[in-house]
């Protein structure tokens, strides 16, 4: 049985005395990466490892330097009684560009073109390895907008929106095509889809977004922007604030959206 497992079972900090620094840092990294943007008090690590705060701070500094060196994100320290440390999953620079180029190459495969001029994307949208990284890239692009909620519409935009919400550590809200009795009173709007030019309905429960909430809209595909405009109207009907719109793929035409 590993030393860390023994510690967790015994609940005693002194059993961690034999744990090497590299083992502590691996465990710290796992705990932080599993909860993006969640503020974890330093005392939590002190109790978990049975170490002094100064030692924990030194370990966290090494973790931060390593993450930044390899462009895997960074650690943000918040001072004060209610402070702590949180992992910010930045994806930018060379790593972000490599990820986007890989996705672009897959989308440009000739056999992806389907009748109607559409691109088959489902295998990419449901690839969690890809969606996790794209979610972190989008989070990095919109981090300065400080959204309170991530909003999408069912169904294909959900996987990407889930990973954006995870990267931000913010609630995900999903607009439906029809209202559900189990969700209480709702607001519904009609909008014109850009892909087919048909009038469709989307609905959102009134409890989903409070007034003055900052909302980031996420979707998988944009042609004329009808769906995004519909989502924006829903947010405005609920007295929310749209801080941005992020999509995985947007057609060149029509322009503007």
Give the residues covered by each predicted segment.
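PRPP-associated nucleotide enzymes
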Residues: 3-217, 224-257
